[in-house]
Structures are given as structure tokens and as C-alpha cells.
């Protein structure tokens, strides 16, 4: 298993208190595949460097987890299907 970090930018219209519960649905995919979610860090609403889907702000979330590569692809695919997710970026970290 490898260690990954995923940055997610969410639609700013979403309430910040509902971010963690809405992400649990996607992080359960990691847990079901015998992976481990190490840390979920919600940075909150920040200004974007450039507009994404005509939005000037976004809610930033960084998630550190350990799992197989196929699981990462599935989590990224599910996140991109969600309309409230503006952008995702997955990085494999050396941990």
C-alpha cells in the first residue's frame, strides 16, 4: 500500500459544517478496501488563483490516506462525478 494526499476544492455555496459528513461517503471507499484515512484537514473558504467554473472562491480540503492505487482511482472518479467538487488533485507522497 502507498501513501497518498488528495486536495479537493469544493463549491463555496456549500455550508462548511457539511463538508466533513459529505466527504465521509467517499472516504468509506478507502476504508472498505482495507485502506487507512490518516488525516482530513479542512482549510475552509479561500480565494482561487483563477476562476474555476465561474467561481472565485472554493472550500479547500486536504486528505492524507494509505491504500492501493486502484482505490485512489475510484475515489478520484467518484469525487469528479459530484457537482459540488470543483477540482481534485491526487499526489503520491513518500511517507
Swiss-Prot record:
GO CC terms: cytoplasm; ribonucleoprotein complex; ribosome
Gene Ontology BP terms: translation
A Pfam family matched in the record: Ribosomal_S6
GO molecular function: small ribosomal subunit rRNA binding; structural constituent of ribosome
Family per similarity comment: Belongs to the bacterial ribosomal protein bS6 family.
NCBIfam families in the record: S6
UniProt xrefs under HAMAP family: Ribosomal_bS6
Described purpose of this protein according to its UniProt entry: Binds together with bS18 to 16S ribosomal RNA.
Protein name, entry field: Small ribosomal subunit protein bS6
Lineage of source species: Bacteria, Bacillati, Actinomycetota, Actinomycetes, Mycobacteriales
